[in-house]
Amino acid sequence: MRIFPGNFGQRVFLKHSLLQFVGLFCVCCFLIISCGRSTSVNSPNSNTDASRVTIGTTLKIRTIDPADAYETLSAQLFYNLGDRLYAYESGSTKLIPQLATALPKISDDGLTYTIPIRQGVSFHDGTVFNAAAMVFSLDRFIKNSGRPSFLLGDLVDSVKATGEYELTIKLKKSFAAFSSLLTFPNLCAISPKVYEIGDGKFKPDTFVGTGPYQLTKYGSDSLKLDVFDKYWGEKPSNPGVNLQLLSSPVNLFNSFRTGAVDVAYLSLDPEQIRNLEKGAKEEKWYAIASQSNTVNYMVLNQKSKPLDQLEVRQAIALMIHRPLMNERVLLGQALPLYSLVPTTFSELYQPVFKDKYGDANFAQAKELLTKAGFSPTNPAKVEIWYPTGSGRRALVAQLLKALAKRHLDGLLQIEIQTVESATLYKDLEKGVYQSVLVDWYADFFDADNYIQPFLECTKGSVSGGCEKGASQGQGSFFYSEKANQLIDKERQEINPKKRQEIFAKLQTILADEVPYIPLWQDRDYTFSQKAITGVILEPTQSFLFSPIRKQ
């Protein structure tokens, strides 16, 4: 997920917070877990069926209202409880119809999308699905002003049912990746009889959609999903899923090793992953690994001294030692990254930071710091912040501090700071932090979602930085009129080769100006017991429960 509703600061808060695995909050969760409230819904399926699948995770859930949710776990639930107009073919990034019956018909000016709607679909409460129900779902997503509402609100002019089973969407301006955006998990159909439209009118513990599973229990420590027997599509391979929300990676690790959970899904620490991989090689269980699209990076606040000086930002970029970081901190479980666009976009990814700065280029870093006026008696002082409880980022910050101390002759002095994640993301847009270590999980599978949220600024200047817009919300306050123009151009360009050229220019700007420093790209790890088959991590990072079978 990413960060930004109408107010960009809220966007940042959510996008990043959903990717932080644990914090001091987890201690509190452990203490109150037995007191958690739960909501149950009647279901014909048995609660004690031995073939049900139990999935354990440390991911947190705040709400399951698709108009307001913006966390990783809620997104995965929507993939399994709901359907969208479009999805991706399993095992690929090919766009296929889901609640639509064909790809959209797009007008010559790129502003009007006409979409045929599937017939014979029912919601979990028995309400019939049609174009009017899809209009309701998309309108509510925009008008209820939840955290992800900007995704459609900034782009869509109107959504109308132009037939009982035909939908017409008009855009404010053309966007080449709009069809991909419609795969965003929160843009699922929801029952008009259960939900209502209105600013802030959310149902945080309710979900009534059209997907293969229906929610029958919602609690602070567990959720229960039963198969929807009237589902229009292929039926799941299991009778239902029990989702256990565990308070820490240690609890997830131990629960899996003792067999209390069938599948361990996000997030484990590197040492725990290495231990479980060893067990998989000994055939105790299965390990499923895939290249993730999540990027990890360092934000540099250009309004904060000394990071307002380009030479200082470039010196930090020169100092970064990604191979060592991957070896020592991440235990080889990641991929060194040299752009904000992940390597999975092979035709668009440009390793611009490798070409311009390399790794561990300490001599040139010292030259730039000296040129900027710093010395051992007058060092550049930079604070590196990270969310409390992020063990990996704590170690990365310590590594960067050690590299500066050992190799930069006192020219750069790094101080490590940590703060609770909710506070960090709330204050990011206020310019409170000099630099921050964070990550990004995209909303939809298009390279635009790794560039526009970082480099675009709707109001600002080169001298004053970004006053309103994406880069302000990210905490870099980067402003470039050229970048703004290129982003607007790539969003409207439908020719793949021309779009590729534009993305190359944008990545060059990223490397030249250094508002962010890409560090690594995650690999996702999931582990399953030997009685479990069908666990698949999709290239788009969706985790579907339907194929999982317990023998």
Where do the protein language model's features map onto the residues?
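Surface-exposed binding/hinge segments that line
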Residues: 20, 114-116, 150-194
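N-terminal lobe/hinge region of extracytoplasmic solute-binding protein
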Residues: 56-108, 139, 208-209
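Gly/Pro-rich hinge or "lid" segments in bacterial periplasmic/extracellular proteins
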Residues: 89-91, 183-236, 240, 250, ...
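Extracytoplasmic/peripheral linker and loop segments enriched in polar/acidic and small residues
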Residues: 104, 411-429, 452-529, 551
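Alpha-helical secondary-structure segments
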Residues: 130-137, 164-170, 211-212, 238-240, ...
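Extracellular/periplasmic solute-recognition and catalytic clefts
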Residues: 158-160, 216-224, 242-304, 327
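Ligand/substrate-recognition segments at binding pockets and active sites
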Residues: 220, 370-443, 524
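Structural transition elements
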Residues: 336-372, 388-395
